[in-house]
């Protein structure tokens, strides 16, 4: 079940909010946990034992850590992290590792039967759990004594599909604040966030994404038949689709959280206005970047142990970033691609970029869009070699004229909505309550029309 489905919007969400608001005090966490379990099990219960076992194990780990003498505490986080990573590696990476070993050494290892679909949200909730373990071990938070609160944090359904990866230390105070859980200002913000996120997903992402799908799908024109201009148009469309899909879901997630009384930090901050790759990664998937910074880069020494060590730390972080996104070599290459760009910027390029903002912006967009070409290279119909050939070796083929005529409005709208203009405009609309209400109602009706007519309700980042 996804946020932009008819079932979620018109059945699950209204009933979930009604039950949540009716139950007072600590009972809200119980209701939240039950709703999260129902949400998790909607597509099947085969992975329910996995997440229940992980919740029980990590809850007991926290209690044990709180009672263990200092001399033994160093062993406990290592064991806990290994257990959690083992679950992630088994379901997400085991067959990729087996296939890689077979290619390297012809070992003839058989693939494991881990299911065709990943356990829902495993990449996100494992990282949430590890952040809890790290913060408990370092004393940033106390171990959670309430099993309901801990389980509600791990299973929190607004963040289960595509995050954001909210740290426990940011959620814990809110999980235990029952009196002020629901207030009018936060609920109003929640409605706005959810509505804007839904619009980004169903109006922009899905409409723009149809262009890229038509280019690479077997039922479409096929990448091998397109011209160089159409290849560029297609990868730009994919770049916009990915942004509006992921940013839209992140806003819907934060909107749902706000409706339930939780104030969560934004996961995106207009990344396509960036004037460097460094700035781009401060604005894109902020919760993931922050997680790698806090739990890998800084513990490894960050930039405190000399230039060579810093380069090694950056290499490990960006290799891990690529691997986190999927069990495929293109994701690893994509992560290392950004490592190289960031090293170049850090060592000399940034000072030149600051002198010419327009050139810096064009440079950033070019390499980000090119990076998405590497990112999407595991999709059937979009092999990296063919895509790069189409992009950089001028050649004829199907013209982009038809696609500009059919998708041009959405592409222009996508570019405009990637800028600061919508934020500036909404600030002015919000000054007049009546105008704000009318605009919100019209946008909601438009979103509903798109939701009802939609044939595809998937979330791109749910696959990671």
What feature does the model see in each segment?
Residues 1-463:
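Membrane-embedded transmembrane alpha-helical bundles that form the catalytic cores
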